[in-house]
Every structure is written in C-alpha cells, then in structure tokens.
Design a protein with these regions (language model features):
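An N-terminal assembly and electron-transfer interface module characteristic of large anaerobic redox
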Residues: 1-405
Length: 405
C-alpha cells in the first residue's frame, strides 16, 4: 500500500465514518483495522465506531465465516445504539472466498447488515469511497414530495481535520435559505433514508456514482462543485447553488466582498511577497480543485504541483519537489518529512492530519478560512530558519518594515 494513495478498504472506512448510529465492522486482518483506525483516532478519539473480527492464519485455511458470524453477534450485544453494521471485507476474505453475503443473510438480529466489498487490491482509496457510498442505496426511502431548498452533501469525510467546523460554517452561510438535509460527514441513518427528499445533491469530488443513481431512481439532480476555499471559492459555490435552486444569494455575496476587503487590508503587506512563489498541493479530490483555485487566484502563488493523493506516491512527490522546488507544501501529515528535508512550511489541511489537531471552531472555507490559511502560511514562513537570501527574505523585510512603522 502506498501511504498517500492507500487502498479501497481505507476509502470505505472513511466514507462511512460519519454515520453516527452505524458500526463499521472490518472483516479482515488486524493490520487493516490498525492502519485505518490510527488515522481516524488522532482527530476524533471520542467517536470511534469501528471494530474488526481479526482474521488469523487458521482462518485463512479454514475460512473466516465463523469469526464473522461471532463478530456480528458481539456487535449486536455491545453496540446497542447502532442501527446498522457495515461489514467492510478486505483482501484476505475475498481471496479465500468467504461467503460474506450469505453470512449476513442468515444472521438474526435487529441491526441492518450491509456488505461493502473493498479488498485493497481492487482499487485505491477513491474507489473504496464510491463503493461505500453506493452501499447506502438500500437504506434510501422514496419521498412522496421534495422538500424545497434542501441539499445533500457528498464527498467530505468525517476524518477531514476541519470537516465539522466547515459544515457549521457552511450552514451559517446558507442560513435560512437552504437546509442541509444530509451531509455524509455527520449524519444518522434517518438522515440517509430521507436523502431522496432533497431538491439537490452536492458532490465535492466524490459521490457522483451515488448521485447518478439517485437521479435515476428518485429524481434528485446533482451538481459537482469545488470545495469553497477562500472568498472567491465561496462566492463561486453560492452562485452555482443559487442558479441550481433559483435562490438569490446577493446579500451573502456582498458580505463576502466586505470580509475580503477587511482581510486584504490586514494581510496585503505580507501577501505581496508570496506572489508567484511556487507551492505544492497534495490532497484528495474533494479538496484539490478548490485549494488550487485559492492559491492561484486569491493568493497569486504559482501552483507547481497539484496532485490527487489517490494517484500519487511519496516517492513521486519527492521527485516533483526536487524538480520544482516549492517553498510551501499543503496537504496531510504525510508531507512532514518532505517539508523538513527542504526546510519549507507545511500547511496541514487534509486527511490524515495526525500531528496537528483542531480544538477550536476554526474553518478553512469562506473568508474565515482564507484568514486562517493566510495566517498559517505567513507564520510558517516566519518560523523557518533565517536566511538573508532565502525565498522568504522579502516577506521578512516587509514584516520588519510594517512592525517598525
């Protein structure tokens, strides 16, 4: 498994982690549980609904169906608050031919049992996300009528470092004009069942296969959007949403303009020295397009590397960094060693972030998000070892001049 691209099982676990009253049961070896849990646990140790039946050597020989059935019985006994169990099967049971569907069909209990077939060899983390999303279809219930100005959100995962705060910030922007019916990064089984009631589905990178199925079966249209980083990113999103739902967001757009003017007034003396400096981005596809637009269009930096982590490896990232010499890295904690090697700042904004946590209501979207990202970039530059002729020399000089004045 390549650390950046990971595997289908990791993607399935990520996609299902936001369903508060559902349990993820991995039918696989212990390493799958340890790896996927380690990335999630760092950010949310208080919300872990993930277990494993742990297939051993003897189960490879004799079959793992017995341990799966026992695990399902234990899940029913221990996780009484969970109305559903998603059995995510990994490489080993699929290679030895375990009849997972047969076990689920013959296991009695009150919990809904759904199989997500996600062996690592079958695809990368992106394919696992889409497979897990499609597994939600049996839970959906047809709606007699649509609820006007309501949306579902696909693509943002519960373990994204700012997922909760970004969702709350988005709700503030939408106000009373648009209701979020179901956001898969923070929802219940009831919310999922009611998804066909929504007027529109929003896909941030992921979720298009599920959205297409919902459009065909339930008549819910969808739009693909870039994640609304920064002022311009949020403005673009609101215009896109307003056009689809026939809603006027002119007041919200004006508020964003005012916030942008205030932010520029406070940060322009520093940001002018970042113009056209090379930056490298490596995130999942839910965030990549929005980040690329933010750095290029709002900050004026030169994006020399913009890679979807599902198609990339750390070795290739190192080769690209050696070639393009970025002065800033933006992505996950996996980029830390590379940032240390080149002595450049790392802005952690994507999964997995296991060496920097967020306990505040900070967000990465809209004007508040732009301010936080700018703050992290400038502070990261200032914290680098002083070099009189370094790429950040102009930034240091301008800050000294501002402080002197």
């Amino acid at each position: 498994m390549k650390p950046l691209s990971s595997c289908a099982l990791f993607g399935a676990v990520r996609a299902l982690g936001g369903i508060k009253d559902a349990l993820i049961l991995q039918h696989s070896v212990v390493g799958c549980q340890w790896g996927s849990l380690a990335f999630r646990y760092a950010g949310k140790p208080y919300d872990v609904r993930q277990v494993s039946d742990v297939i051993y050597d003897e189960d490879v020989v004799n079959g793992g169906e017995k341990v799966l059935r026992k695990a399902l019985q234990e899940a029913e006994r221990i996780f009484t608050h969970c109305g559903a169990v998603f059995v995510v099967s990994g490489c080993v049971p699929n290679m030895i031919g375990d009849d997972v569907d047969g076990i689920l069909a013959t296991t009695e209990g009150s919990q809904k049992l759904l199989h997500v077939k996600a062996p690592g060899y079958a695809g990368n983390i992106d394919s696992g996300v889409e497979t897990a999303y499609l597994a939600l279809l049996p839970l959906l219930r047809a709606a007699e009528k649509k609820e006007a100005a309501t949306i579902n959100i696909f693509g943002i995962m519960n373990d994204d470092p700012y997922a909760d705060n970004d969702l709350e910030e988005l709700k503030k922007f939408l106000g009373s004009k648009v209701k979020i019916n179901c956001a898969l990064q923070d929802c219940s089984l009831r919310d999922i069942a009611a998804m066909p009631q929504a007027e529109l589905n929003i896909c941030f990178g992921y979720g298009e296969p599920l959205a297409k199925q919902m459009q065909e079966k339930f008549g819910v249209p969808y739009i693909k959007c870039a994640y609304p980083y920064g002022v311009a990113g949020m403005q673009k999103f609101l215009r896109q949403l307003g056009e689809a739902l026939k809603i006027d967001f002119s007041d919200e757009l004006a508020d964003l303009e005012a916030a942008a003017e205030k932010l520029v007034y406070r940060s322009a003396d520093y940001l002018v020295n970042l113009y056209q400096l090379p930056v490298a981005l490596a995130t999942d596809k839910a965030h990549l397009a929005g980040l690329q637009s933010f750095f290029a269009e709002e900050l004026g930096m030169r994006v020399v590397i913009a890679e979807d982590t599902a198609e990339f490896s750390l070795d290739k990232m190192a080769e690209a960094a050696a070639k393009h010499k970025p002065v800033l890295l933006c992505g996950s904690s996996f980029l830390k060693n590379l940032a240390d090697t080149y002595q450049v700042p790392l802005v952690r904004c994507a999964y997995p972030a296991f060496d920097q946590l967020c306990f505040t209501d900070n967000t990465l979207i809209g004007a508040r998000g732009a301010a936080l990202l700018i703050e992290q970039i400038v502070n990261g530059a200032l914290q680098q070892q002083y070099k009189t002729d370094g790429r950040y020399a102009g930034l240091r000089e301008s800050i000294c001049e501002v402080n002197h004045e």
